[in-house]
Amino acid sequence: MLESLFGNPIIEKVLLFLLVNEKSYPSQLRRVFQNPLYSFQRALGRLEKGGVIVSHSEGKTLVYQFNPRYPFLSELKAFLQKAYAFLPQEIQEKYYESMIRKRPRRHGKPL
């Protein structure tokens, strides 16, 4: 829906996912959307370089969230909320509102 505006559908997915879930890491996005990991790493890098999102480390994992100092953050979130409202309900439930781990599992920890 917004890929023509953002230039790529992965960026749209990342921004909407961050809007709903507040934080994310690349392998979580890969698992949810079933796209290559590199696509998400590249999109997150572009957004971070533009100042839209920031990253911090939680253990060995780089976690991304919206940059609270981004000057157009409130406008961007309002725009994304409006776009999210137009998504079909099954897409909202499948990709954005499902039970998603908020922290990565320790490597090697049994399920």
What do these predicted regions represent?
Residues 2-11, 25, 54-80:
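Short, cationic-aromatic polyanion-contact patches
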Residues 3, 14-15, 31-32:
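A generic structural signal for short
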Residues 10-22:
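Short amphipathic alpha-helical interface segments
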Residues 24-32:
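Short acidic, hydrophobic short linear motifs in intrinsically disordered regions
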Residues 33, 47, 56-57, 100-107:
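Non-catalytic effector/regulatory segments
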Residues 34-48:
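Short amphipathic alpha-helical interaction segments
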Residues 51:
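Glycine-centered, phosphate/nucleic-acid-interacting loop/turn motifs that mediate DNA/RNA or nucleotide
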Residues 71-111:
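Amphipathic alpha-helical dimerization/coiled-coil segments
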